[in-house]
Amino acid sequence: MIRELEYYGSHILRRKADIIPEITDTIRQLVQDMYETMVAHKGVGLAAPQVGESLSLFVVCVEGETEDGDLIFCDFPKVYINPVLSNASEDLVIGREGCLSIPGLRADVYRPQSITVTALNLDGQEFTEHLEGFPARIIMHENDHLHGVLYIDKMEEPKDIKKFKASLEKIRRRYHAHVKPEDRAS
């Protein structure tokens, strides 16, 4: 089932997600729904808070990059339950990011070139991956959602931040009548 997305201004996007204590049929159905929602919106990753569930879970549908930098997409998403990131490289690289919860906007964000992620899969088995480049960026972006952080919080260019304020306000107004002050971008 394709779920409705949560958009900028939604309080759930600013909350720390809850740890998933047990992988149930409800969680399995959520993963399927998230995959269908991600595909319908042409995304490469989706975190549970983006579909209204404050749970520590995200799905990604990029397996890697070719030597030419083209993305290799998967047939079914990779599932990351209760992920923990570690070993972020000291090398920061700039990359353009967008977000299904902030439609129509993209910005340059600095992130580590590589990262290690440890998480549970849908069978409850722990796995660890070391990722580099764009796949690492996707993991960091989706993991940020589980901590109430949006990519716009990481923008460093004052001109970009200023340019985004009016656009963010339009998104907030379009999708939400009332937003708590702590959920607004600074």
Curated annotation (Swiss-Prot):
Binds 1 Fe(2+) ion. Its cofactor is Fe(2+). The active site is at E142. InterPro entries: Peptide_deformylase (IPR023635), Peptide_deformylase_sf (IPR036821). Keywords: Hydrolase, Iron, Metal-binding, Protein biosynthesis. It comes from the Bacteria. Its EC number is 3.5.1.88. This is Peptide deformylase. It comes from Chlamydia felis (strain Fe/C-56) (Chlamydophila felis). The gene is def.
